[in-house]
Amino acid sequence: MTMIRMRFLVGAIMLVALAAFPIFSQEEGEMSFFITSTGPGDGANLGGLDGADGHCAMLAQAAGGGGKTWHAYLSTTGAGGVNARDRIGSGPWYNAKGVQVAANVDELHYSNVGLTKETQLSEKGEMVNGRNDDPNQHDILTGSQLDGTRFTDGEDHTCGNWTSNGEGSAQVGHHDRTGGGAVASSWNAAHGSRNCGQT
């Protein structure tokens, strides 16, 4: 989800989608984690959490991953704000090739050794372009801090809770774990975007 030129938000708005289900209710190796291959097309205006979840579910269904409850890995802020980590179930999560990317919520956020450019695939099982690829699509929208919680500093880290495509900012991570920003190797909290538009 970024471009090097004007670096508005991202080349194509990318989200992380995770299936949320009770533990033991999924088949081992069934896809339950992916980076969206395409965004809805209106910058960071995803239609709020419901719109983002619907977009993830639509892409998963088209790729044969239906029958699950899909949630975009996004936090929101303000009154009634939610933490991304609280929306995604308890794991484990597998990519489209059946590789486990994280066993549980703590592993996803703290050790996160299974999260690499090679394992954070699209719903189609394709590798997503990273920092040194053309186009660079390594930024992924999260609106979250390193531990998957929402920001409480009163600043806009979610492009108006995923309803704005203009002014504002969204916290993004780097799916390839490289690049610039305060925490360049973070998959979910590398830096804020310059605005909420789409390049």
Regions found by a protein language model. Give the residues of each.
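Intrinsically disordered, low-complexity regions of eukaryotic proteins
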Residues: 1-2, 108
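Bacterial N-terminal signal peptides
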Residues: 10-20
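Secreted/extracellular ectodomain signature
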Residues: 23-199
